[in-house]
């Protein structure tokens, strides 16, 4: 009798404890949801009494299609063998594809922090990233740290990949004969392939010769066949305008594959029509008429190219405007100028087809960069027909990929506030103060054609106008 009574009491206690456990579980679920959502939501709690329904969600609100916000909680609460309080489902899902973040968000954060502190003691930070310290003690600590964790060591090491080959682009502002201004796009990498015999391992190498004054820049000798890398440190932001600069490039000129010892003698450069200038090309400092392709060893000269030089008679469509003369004294102090040469007249000036003008020395540095990027897209559009119009209308900074071109351009000539040409210089000045000191020695010329207030400049200030920059 006593044994039966004890058995009955034990069964009653087990039943009561299971009932309490079930009620406690439901109460925890109810309190959990009430703590997560404001009390203004009517949860419509309906307690379940059947044993088969234990573990199911007791809230009818989740069955309503008008409450999609609770679908995540409903999935967690209704899933059997899962507790809604441990957030197993959320924790098992990776929050990022970054391996460092995946390690940091690991469950055992204390172990990760210990690992990170150990690894930080093993490496020193410099310009090349995290570099290991050379000592026997550090090597021993490194092996100890690797044995304490299974996480990869490279997760904390900065991995620098070699940047893609830069597509050096030069944007030139060209003043046409009728006073209109236009932009010209040139890809320097296509030109750099012209001297593979001299610099086969330099993909960005460019020719520099004593007569190729447009390619003269610091760190390069004037010996025949000398090349240099456009991406070296000497092409930094010389004017502190936030732009990287390259060597000066005169559009309209094609390099030959090889130069002889006498420039333009047996390997004359090939000329391509690029400037819609005055149809008559005159010899320098003379009024003898247009220069033909046989004069001054110039090969395949296109008469549509305009030669600009000292005392050159520049005429517009009416023939009554002369290009102002500029004294060449200050050109020799800061690099070689485009229209100054020790050779006989009519060689590189005629061959290059004019002085390319850049508009980078202004208050609107970002505006100039946008102009260059927009013009580069125009030049690329005719070659890339697969690009959609939506991609072309998006600024490059917002749609840039790893293989996109890097726009590199510079300032020449430098324009003062009074809209005068300060100087034509293939090597930019190293600082603004040096430019201001040098500006006093510049021979100011008349206002450049095409820079009227209704064209490129606003009234009064002499800088790029908003109408010229807003079309982006």
Swiss-Prot record:
InterPro entries: Znf_C2H2_type. One of its GO terms (molecular function) is transcription coactivator activity. The keyword RNA-binding does not apply. Its main location: nucleus. A zinc finger (C2H2-type) spans 420-444. Keywords: Activator, DNA-binding, Metal-binding, Nucleus, Transcription, Transcription regulation, Zinc, Zinc-finger. One of its GO terms (cellular component) is nucleus. It is found in: Nucleus. GO terms for biological process: regulation of transcription by RNA polymerase II. Transcriptional activator that controls the onset of premeiotic DNA synthesis by regulating res2 and some other factor(s) in a mei2 independent cascade. This is Transcriptional activator protein rec16. It comes from Schizosaccharomyces pombe (strain 972 / ATCC 24843) (Fission yeast).
């Amino acid at each position: 009798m006593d044994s039966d009574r004890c058995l009955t009491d034990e069964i009653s206690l087990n039943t009561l404890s299971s009932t309490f456990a079930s009620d406690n579980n439901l109460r925890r679920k109810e309190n959990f949801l009430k703590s997560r959502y404001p009390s203004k939501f009517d949860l419509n709690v309906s307690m379940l009494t059947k044993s088969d329904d234990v573990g199911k969600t007791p809230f009818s609100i989740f069955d309503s299609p008008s409450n999609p916000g609770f679908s995540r909680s409903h999935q967690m609460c209704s899933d059997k063998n899962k507790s809604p309080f441990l957030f197993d489902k959320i924790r098992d899902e990776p929050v990022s594809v970054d391996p460092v973040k995946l390690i940091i968000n690991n469950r055992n954060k204390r172990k990760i922090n210990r690992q990170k502190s150990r690894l930080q003691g093993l490496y020193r930070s410099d310009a090349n990233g995290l570099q290991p310290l050379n000592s026997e003690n550090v090597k021993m600590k490194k092996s100890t740290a690797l044995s304490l964790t299974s996480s990869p060591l490279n997760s904390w090491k900065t991995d620098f990949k070699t940047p893609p080959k830069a597509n050096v682009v030069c944007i030139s502002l060209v003043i046409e004969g009728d006073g209109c201004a236009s932009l010209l796009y040139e890809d320097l990498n296509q030109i750099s392939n012209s001297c593979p015999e001299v610099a086969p391992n330099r993909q960005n190498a460019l020719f520099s010769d004593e007569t190729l004054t447009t390619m003269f820049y610091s760190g390069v000798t004037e010996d025949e066949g000398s090349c240099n890398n456009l991406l070296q440190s000497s092409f930094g932001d010389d004017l502190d305008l936030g732009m990287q600069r390259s060597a000066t490039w005169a559009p309209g000129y094609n390099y030959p594959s090889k130069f002889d010892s006498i420039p333009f003698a047996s390997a004359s450069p090939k000329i391509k029509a690029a400037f819609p200038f005055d149809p008559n090309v005159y010899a320098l400092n003379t009024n003898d008429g247009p220069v033909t392709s046989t004069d001054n060893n110039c090969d395949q000269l296109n008469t549509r190219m305009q030669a600009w030089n000292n005392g050159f008679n520049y005429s517009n469509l009416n023939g009554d405007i002369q290009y102002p003369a500029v004294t060449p004294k200050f050109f020799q102090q800061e690099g070689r100028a485009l229209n100054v040469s020790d050779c006989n007249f009519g060689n590189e000036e005629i061959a290059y087809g004019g002085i390319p003008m850049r508009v980078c020395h202004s208050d609107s540095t970002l505006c100039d960069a946008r102009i260059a990027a927009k013009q580069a897209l125009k030049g690329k559009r005719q070659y890339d027909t697969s690009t959609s119009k939506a991609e072309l209308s998006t600024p490059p900074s917002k749609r840039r990929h790893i293989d996109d071109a890097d726009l590199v351009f510079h300032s020449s000539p430098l324009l003062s506030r009074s809209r005068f040409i300060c100087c034509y210089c293939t090597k930019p000045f190293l600082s603004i103060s040096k430019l201001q000191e040098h500006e006093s020695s510049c021979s100011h010329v008349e206002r450049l054609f095409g820079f009227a207030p209704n064209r490129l400049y606003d009234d009064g200030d002499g800088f790029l106008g908003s109408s010229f920059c807003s079309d982006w």
